[in-house]
């Protein structure tokens, strides 16, 4: 057996199969195991090594026959995060630094201390000891272990995030650590590629959600395909970071197992994912390998949803995906499914998918979208609510759901080139996503309510730790959302200090962006190098700068400022600037040293919700630039924030403020002060109104000083104040 492993290891490590067909490795390894005695008795070691190298050459030729797709199908191409170096001291640079130095190491540590690695080790032990059934070691009865069937994905997601870090901040120790984890993961894989520790640890007594056999509970809670999805995403990222196919081969073997066993053909199990993400991941695997089977499987998983025996709104299986026009059910599942639909539609041209996505996105941003960019109103089912059901104190707004919305909105932009999707993405990024992690990267929210009575606090980890590990993989990928290219047009979507190397028409353009956004609205774009000569620069004018908080009537500003920006090139006004779908288009022959200067006014503005949002009637939210603000008790100790009345025409004052939080966290923000009134009652029950001042901080910054009261929507009348807390 040792001999066989040595030979197969030579093949796997040869790197002739970075994208090759893993079935060749599997077949060859089985052949060696069965014939190793004959081989050892019939050939010298030199002959064996020559035979091995010949096999490598043959398999290498097979691998080269795979054609990687030239495009992901979207008409607009994302500039990869590896081509955009975000400055370390910028708003987003600090968050990437926190993810690199705190969040990802913390997640790896938690995977150790919470026994996530042990799950793989126990599964490997079971595979290595076929007679073991778990009964001799009761702690290995999975039904009694304190684990969830998707705990494996926390390992995968953290590896994915670490792999993104490796691509921008090479770290040999981190690379070696990941390699050691992959040894554990590989050992837990069953001979046919199946990798799901909740069953493999003890097939006789798997986790209660796993079902007696493979796939039978997939449409409920087994998460077998969910595990596949995160594994594939992580494996693709690891391959792109290291060039090693070690993880990629593991993931492909599981994906190939799924393709063999899950589908509409006779002898297969016809199920669709109970928790979506495999659709996006399999599409990504197709783009990396060129193996169309993965794209076909992704489309099957979407096309058959609503056509199997399971019909639940919770998992969006209540009807076929092309018939869905509203966002319903578990918000994370939904967001991942919609993003997967976009990926498949881009590659297949399925207009029915696109029509459904247009309707769903419109439903979200016009009726089910929080001012913070979060989604998922209900704790029950972590789900979207009905139209205009947007409670504040009980809002769920899972961090993972916000990340899913970023995936969806960005894909819709790549498909349609409309800035309204980036406007929504920006709102979600600056409020709904980063509120899910503390500024130092060490504590996390699962739900993100818009009101708190002091019972909500970030935690260092969760039993169900999907949100921290999701942050691990998302934050390092942020630079990939800043720019995009279509033909000879460069889209500037987000504003953060960075240097980008962009390919336009096959020629390199180096662009430097300087800004202190989101604290002020001055953005300078300097051409450092330009081999492309003439091209169009499409600069997004944020919706908040043109009186449009969201692309619907769900929210509106109480004032009316229709133009809050100015733009110059080399200090001079630009003549003949065109606007298209929310972008200013400047088309010219660019020279090294050219500077585009965009100034966005950043007044403090109040927002009101559509009257059909009953929880927000008579109340206003406060915004400045892309940031939503909130009142927190820690800044307002002289009165209850729940009894504050915002005046009809408030006068705001923007001030610098340092938040000295718990756990040695200290950071600066732009705070907002406003004079108003506080309402109370005397001993006889009579209402008393007195003048006071309220301080507001960015929503993402709350809860760094312990659990405390917090409010986003502030009343403007005693009637709206409602019951005192």
Segments predicted by a language model, with ranges:
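Bacterial Sec-dependent N-terminal signal peptides
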Residues: 1-65
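Aromatic (Trp/Tyr) and acidic
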Residues: 64-172, 176, 206-241, 276-293, ...
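Helix-capping and short linker residues that terminate individual alpha-solenoid repeat units
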Residues: 170, 186-190, 243, 259-263, ...
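Aromatic-lined substrate-binding rim segments of carbohydrate-active enzymes
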Residues: 174-186
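Asp-box/WD-like beta-propeller blade repeats and closely related beta-sheet repeat scaffolds
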Residues: 201-222, 248, 253-269
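C-terminal beta-rich recognition modules with glycine/proline-rich loops and embedded aromatic residues
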Residues: 298, 357, 423-431, 436-526, ...
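Flexible glycine/proline-rich, aromatic-decorated loop/lid segments
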Residues: 312, 369-387
